């Protein structure tokens, strides 16, 4: 019985480590999807309390060796949504790469934009700059 438990535990552990691994092509898809996200949301949302796809993407990108570069590409991408740029700011803050000097240089175009945010099950609009300062001062995760 003990041997079966050990084999099952080792099998489960090896499958979990394979599941957690993503190659660079996977990160390209994650980056592309995150760049087109239409709302910004942190924490549990909706009736069943789910984490948003954007937040899951940030968590996945943080596992990458090139996380800083991915978040900077999103932040500097003129086709990326303002919501995705807030997720990029979250990732950069988590990595310790976001500071007051980045405010106007990276996010100048989005500064006065309205951003769709989802809190619980309420979708509303807020100014990019207000959300950005919240990220800068308090982080996201």
Task: Give, region by region, the residue ranges found by the protein language model.
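Alpha-solenoid helical repeat scaffolds
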Residues: 87, 118-121, 131
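Alpha-helix N-cap/helix-start positions at coil->helix boundaries
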Residues: 80-82, 113-116
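HEAT-repeat alpha-solenoid elements in large eukaryotic scaffold proteins
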Residues: 37-51
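Residue-level detector of extended alpha-helical repeat arrays and alpha-solenoid scaffolds
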Residues: 51-54, 84-85
């Amino acid at each position: 019985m003990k041997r079966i438990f050990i084999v099952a535990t080792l099998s489960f552990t090896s499958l979990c480590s394979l599941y957690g691994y993503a190659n660079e092509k996977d990160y390209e898809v994650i980056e592309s999807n995150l760049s087109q996200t239409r709302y910004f949301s942190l924490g549990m949302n909706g009736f069943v309390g789910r984490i948003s796809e954007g937040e899951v993407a940030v968590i996945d990108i943080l596992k990458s060796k090139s996380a800083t570069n991915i978040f900077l590409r999103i932040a500097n991408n003129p086709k990326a949504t303002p919501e995705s740029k807030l997720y990029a700011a979250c990732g950069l803050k988590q990595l310790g790469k976001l500071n007051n000097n980045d405010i106007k240089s990276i996010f100048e175009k989005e500064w006065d934009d309205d951003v769709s945010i989802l809190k619980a099950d309420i979708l509303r609009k807020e100014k990019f700059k207000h959300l950005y300062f919240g990220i800068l001062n308090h982080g996201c995760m």
